[in-house]
Amino acid sequence: RGAVDALAESLSTAKPLFFGRVQRVRRMANELAMKQDVPNAWRVDVASVFSQLAYLALPENVTEDVYYRRDLSKEVKSLLAKFPEDTRNILNKIPGLEEVGEILKSVDVQYRFEEEKEDGVRLAASILKVALDFDYYEEQGYNRSIIVSTLKERNKDYDPKVTQSLSDLIVIAEETSTLQEIKIDDIDIGMRLSQELRLDDGFLIAAAGTDVDRQLLKVIRNYNSCYAESPFPKRVQVIVPVNLLK
């Protein structure tokens, strides 16, 4: 688990947008795997991280275009087409992660065309697909309930038992956390960014969905200490667990 965390952290500095996606997808996929009682659920966790790892190789000038799926040049599309193979090559060099590669390979295969086996690979792939697509649509600004309804209706593309678990998780999340707008100085460990955190000049520090941990808090404080006035927006939207509410 420590090695996987280190891989995820490598994205936080180099590609904060994709690190934010890793955190969101990883969190969602792990919760879905728990509800579905997936065998060897650690594979879902690892696959969530590796699903975004190849984006480390993206040139900085096209990172946001790729992340937001804007119009891309033929050259960039060609580069992206090689990412699945690049990821498999990395996985092939790590003993014991063969099934993680199988999960990633099956994500874009409709679940009904692959038989579910005892190894749980098909179910794990279905979970990762739901987590990835839910995250994409939420990033586009769609309401969570609409996303869930849409995925549930597309029962030939998404495993119904996984989308039902997704629906259950969204209800629980709404009951156990709340959206608040707070001063940047009040941000604290355990909160989660609900919007991108950028400097006043537009430089991205952390993506929406990033968990506020000691490292991010340190980065914010370091920036504040280097400027006469804080370079961050005066207020920021965060998700606050109910147990942190004062």
Task: Tell me the role of every PLM-derived stretch.
Residues 1-5, 22-23, 27-28, 65, ...:
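Terminal helices and disordered tails flanking the catalytic cores of nucleotide-processing hydrolases
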Residues 4-19, 29-36:
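Short regulatory/linker helices and ligand/cofactor-binding micro-motifs at input modules
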Residues 13, 54, 109-111:
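Active-site/binding-pocket entry motifs
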Residues 43-47, 127-128:
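Active-site alpha-helix of zinc metalloproteases
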Residues 46-50, 103:
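Short hydrophobic alpha-helical segments used for membrane anchoring or interfacial signaling
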Residues 52, 56, 133:
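Catalytic glutamate of the conserved HExxH
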Residues 55-60, 141:
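Regulatory and interdomain segments flanking nucleotide-handling catalytic cores
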